[in-house]
Amino acid sequence: MWRSKNLRALCDRLDLQLVVKAPPGAFADAGAPLARLSKPVEAADEDALCACFNLGSDRDFRSDPCFGLIVLSEIASKALSPGVNDPGTAIHTIRAIQRVLHKWSVTLAEKADEDTDPEDQTQRVFLPGISVRHALECGFDPISFDGANRPVITRTLLSALSGLKAQDEALFSAQADELAQAMLA
């Protein structure tokens, strides 16, 4: 996770641009750069920039949005296990994932409206977004696998994907269709 306000302030002060290469929750490989700078900086400034990143061995909901989808998906998968056999909880969890993804799409739309200032030529920090495909896979793939032999789960998953498409066709349509086709294959 990064602290974008701190990054922006530092980049403003140093008059540079910074491109973050890894999305939140990504595995940070010691051999791969976390970010690229538009120009070299002093060691102290490099340390200050590095301090804006939160690296650790554990994922958390605040800094890694897809982690929340994964945890919800694991709850549904556990509910579908033979020892638990609780499809109602799995269905409830699928709907919770749908609500989370819908809220995300609304937030993205609001953010896009805020970011359309043609006068702002001072963007300093470029952060990677979370892909729709990745979000849908984190939320629905494990449930689809574990619930493949349960028509009620497949119907609920397809209904959730259809609902997401209806709520934001431009954002969800292509990936939701691909995931639905994979579920039915």
Language model features: what each stretch is:
Residues M1-L16, P23, A32-A185:
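Short basic (Lys/Arg) and small-residue
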Residues K21, F27-A28:
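Residue-level "contact hotspot" at macromolecular interaction interfaces
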